[in-house]
Amino acid sequence: NMRKYLHTKPYFVLLTIILLVGCQKQPQKVRILNENPVLDSAMMAQLQMNIHLADAADRDCKEFVETDSITYAMDDLGFWYAKTITGNTDTVQLGQELLLHLQISEIGGNLISDSKHHHIMGSGELPMAINRSLKMMCIGDQMQIVAPWYTAYGVEGTSLIKPYSNLFI
């Protein structure tokens, strides 16, 4: 019995040491985004600017919908929408080909684009606000969307739409 105990005791001591070492508090690691402080600094500045611009966009969009005669609802993504014409009760299905008529203006401003084009539902080709709105629509519905830039064409824009544009669609 003693021999058995002596053979197991070193394992017990070793196990105890491993557990104690494993329980020591690990030092916090500094998170580096790109391993390059200059790039990290530029990325953080861009992020802070985008947060500031998103807040301003939210204020502008809210002010616009509050002064419009139509009652809008706000989506949890941050855009506002109002169904202005109700079509039939056939919901739009994933993969379905749709004919869309999109009129896009700057909020309270100039018409940027007035176009009809075919779109496959769920293809991801359209901005977030439009894709999400299509999911809420039935065939024949018309909807007005007030979209802050981060749910519209974002920081890049398009050939017609400037970056950071808040849009009325």
Regions found by a protein language model. Give the residues of each.
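Cross-family detector of peptidyl-prolyl cis-trans isomerase
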Residues: 6-7, 23-169
